[in-house]
Amino acid sequence: MGTVKLGIKNNIVLFSLLIIINLFVGFMVGLERAILPIIGEEHFGLTSVSAALSFIISFGFSKAIVNYFAGQIADKIGRKRVLLIGWGIGLFVPILVIIAHAWWVIVFANVLLGINQGLTWSMTLNMKIDLAKSNQRGFAVGLNEFAGYVGVALMAVISGYIASTYSLRPEPFYMGIVIVLIGFLLSLFVKDTNKHLQIEAQKKKNSDVISSREVFKRTTWTDKNLSSISFAGLSTNLKDGMSWGLFPFFFISAGLTFNQIGVIVAIYPAAWGFFQLFTGALSDRIGRKWLIASGMWVQAFSLWWILFVDIYALWIVGALMLGIGTAMVYPTFAAAISDVAHPEWRASSMGVFRFWRDSGYAFGALLAGVLADMLNISWAIGLVAILPLLAGIMIATRMKETLV
């Protein structure tokens, strides 16, 4: 293996480059986070909430499916190639939004955004885990997610400001083309992590070669730890898909401006990103189980808080709490999966987990849209909050501590 060593400090240049790249990955989602639901209503005349949220459904399902295959593909052709392919596909997203003449073009652009995110974010995550020692995984994942969600938050604020100053479209999306080009160029300088992966695999006990089908079964239902984490991940992003789609409508109906909505919509992922700097490392010290369980309960409480207060400052507090609750679980999910899965099939197991987690975007938007159309937006938010509550109970009663 030559001079190849595991550990963040031993690979600080590559590790830092991957952090910067994931910042740009996050920019891609943040670009449309605060404004695309409103574009559907104002530019394309959508009156049904379900129709307006169809772009999140397309994003969620495409990202989920790509996550599943990205891990398997990366195990075969290497992480770097998958990363570059992801950026290449991402270039079409802002271009399609700019030229879109009908809503289906926006929906298709978000299919491509889901593919872009599934490939790029998965690879920056897996490569950091490859580089880190086993007792650094929570911290490594925390840094990765910190960078990504700070990117989401920053671009949500910037795009909201540009939309208020100029228009909802096309001005904010010119930045998207620049983001993709920079992300692709930075990724050219990445070195693949296959040698680091081989070192760790040699240190582990020999593992039977298992099929992709078996990895899917273990991660989805037969392994109590992996399957409990997968359900909690799905519940977390189901809540996020609902928040992404309904928060702009909820706050517009409360009389807030685009700028104010941009701030609230940005604070949530900003807190989500920032606090992962600490929660990932904390899980390396105190364990994964109770950090996940309590984080799920904080998310549920935060949604009910947002629902029942009616002051801008208190909505900001609610968004902050929602971000903290999500930060408690997000890096801990991936670290716990890495604790359980053998290096030889870890990326595949991570892909299955991320398949279920990110399908939550689609299920959340679908459920929220149906509930909002049948009842109202407030009822939709309140009912969706039950899922994180139940997931926390499942983690508390079914999952064992994975950090040993």
Locate predicted features.
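Juxtamembrane intracellular "pre-TM" segments in multi-pass secondary transporters
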Residues: 1-12, 194-229
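Helix-loop boundary and gating motifs at the non-cytosolic
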Residues: 10-60, 225-228, 232, 236-254
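Residue-level signature of mid-helix packing/kink "hotspots" within the transmembrane helices
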Residues: 59-68, 152-153, 269-277, 361-362
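Helix-to-loop junctions at the C-terminal end of transmembrane segments
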Residues: 66-78, 163, 276-287, 372-373
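Structural signature of the two symmetry-related core transmembrane helices
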Residues: 81-95, 290-305
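Paired small-residue
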Residues: 93, 104-112, 302, 313-321
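Cytoplasmic helix-loop-helix junction between adjacent transmembrane helices
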Residues: 111-149, 335-336
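Symmetry-related core transmembrane helices of the 12-TM Major Facilitator Superfamily/SLC fold
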Residues: 171-188, 381-396
